[in-house]
Amino acid sequence: MKEKLQQIKNTALEELNKISNKAELENIRVKYLGKKGELTQILRGMGKLSSQERPVIGKLANEVRGSIEELIEKAVTEIKLKEKEAKLKNEVIDISMPGRKQTVGRKNPLQLTLDSIMDIFISMGFSIEEGPEVEKDYYNFEALNIPKNHPARGEQDTFYINDDVVLRTQTSPIQVRTMENQKPPIKMIAPGKVYRSDSVDATHSPIFYQIEGLVIDKGITFADLKGTLELFTKKMFGEKMQTKFRPHHFPFTEPSAEMDATCFVCGGKGCNVCKNSGWIELLGCGMVHPDVLRNCGIDPEVYSGFAFGFGLDRMVMQKYELDDIRLLYESDMRFLNQF
C-alpha cells in the first residue's frame, strides 16, 4: 500500500509537470482527487486495513493528498500567469494610431438657469446656503409653523424615512438652519433638490429643484420684498418684464402672496404657455411669520424679514417651451445639444 501511494504521488507529479492548460489540470485533479479518483479509492478502503496499518497508511495517504493539492494550486498559478502573458503579447497597442474622439457633454438647462439665478442673487448681495436633503421633521415642518396634523401637511406627499426623518419637501429647512446659526442681518438663497411622492409623468417628478430666498434685518417691509423680486425678474428676463402680486396663504409667511410675471415666451401678448393670459405664475412669497422667527431664536419685535421660493423645473419648462419634465433628467445629448 505504501508503494502504491508513493507511485501515485510520483505519477501525479510527473503529469502535473507536463500540463499546459486548465483542462489538462482538471483531468489530473479528477483522476487522483475526484470522487472516483485513485487516491480517493485508497482512502475509502482504509477500513479494511488492520488497526496497526491504518494510522500509518492514513498519515501517508493524507501527506500524498496534501502534496498533490499543493502541486495543483501551484500549477493553477503558473497557468494563469502564462495566460496573462500570452494575452498581453497578443494585445499589442499601436500608440501611433489616432485616438477615438470623445463626445463632449453639455450643461443641462436646469444647471444653466440655476447658474444664472445664483449669479444674479450674488450680485444683489445674497449668499448661497446649503443643507441636508435627508431632513428632520422639525426643520421641514414644525419650525416653519406647520405642526403635526396641520392641514398644510396634507398638501405635500412626503417621503418619510421614519416618524422623525423625511426627504425634504422644500428647501425652507435651510432657511431655518441659517437663522439658527447666523445672527441677522441675513440675506441668502437656498437652491437644491426636493422630494415629493408624485408619480412620474410629463409634468410631475418625485425629484425636482427649488430655490428659496430669505432676508432678515431690522425694518424690512413688504416694499423691500417687492423691490427685490422685481429687480431679480428684470435681471433674469429683461427690463420689459412686469410683475404683479396676488394675495395667497402660506403657513410660514404673513402676509403671503404669489407673484406673476409677464410671460417670457410671448411678452404678454398671450400664448399656450400662459394660457393666453399674458402672465405666468412665477413664485410664492411673503413676510416671515413671527412664530417662525421665534422658533429660530430671533425676536420678531426687533427683526422682520421676507421669504420667497419657486420651482426651477417649471421655470425652465416655461422658458424653453418644454412639454415634458422628463427631458430634463434623461441626459439625452440630442436634447442637451440644443442649449
From Swiss-Prot:
Cross-referenced Gene3D superfamilies: Bira Bifunctional Protein, Domain 2 (3.30.930.10)
Subcellular location(s) of the protein: Cytoplasm
GO cellular component: cytoplasm
InterPro entries per record: aa-tRNA-synth_II, aa-tRNA-synth_II/BPL/LPL, Phe-tRNA-synth_IIc_asu, Phe-tRNA_ligase_II_N, Phe_tRNA_ligase_alpha1_bac, Phenylalanyl-tRNA_Synthase, tRNA-bd_arm
Enzyme Commission code(s) on record: 6.1.1.20
SUPFAM superfamilies registered for this protein in UniProt: Class II aaRS and biotin synthetases, tRNA-binding arm
Cofactor(s) this protein cannot do without: Mg(2+)
Gene Ontology biological process terms in this record: phenylalanyl-tRNA aminoacylation
Keyword terms, alphabetized: Aminoacyl-tRNA synthetase, ATP-binding, Cytoplasm, Ligase, Magnesium, Metal-binding, Nucleotide-binding, Protein biosynthesis
Any coiled-coil regions, as ranges: none
Residues at which Mg(2+) binds: E254
Co-factor note (free text): Binds 2 magnesium ions per tetramer.
GO molecular function: ATP binding; catalytic activity, acting on a protein; magnesium ion binding; phenylalanine-tRNA ligase activity; transferase activity; tRNA binding
Pfam families xrefs: Phe_tRNA-synt_N, tRNA-synt_2d
UniProt cross-references to NCBIfam families, sorted A to Z: pheS
Matching HAMAP family: Phe_tRNA_synth_alpha1
Family the entry assigns: Belongs to the class-II aminoacyl-tRNA synthetase family. Phe-tRNA synthetase alpha subunit type 1 subfamily.
Subunit structure: Tetramer of two alpha and two beta subunits.
Protein name: Phenylalanine--tRNA ligase alpha subunit
Species, as recorded: Clostridium novyi (strain NT)
Species lineage: Bacteria, Bacillati, Bacillota, Clostridia, Eubacteriales
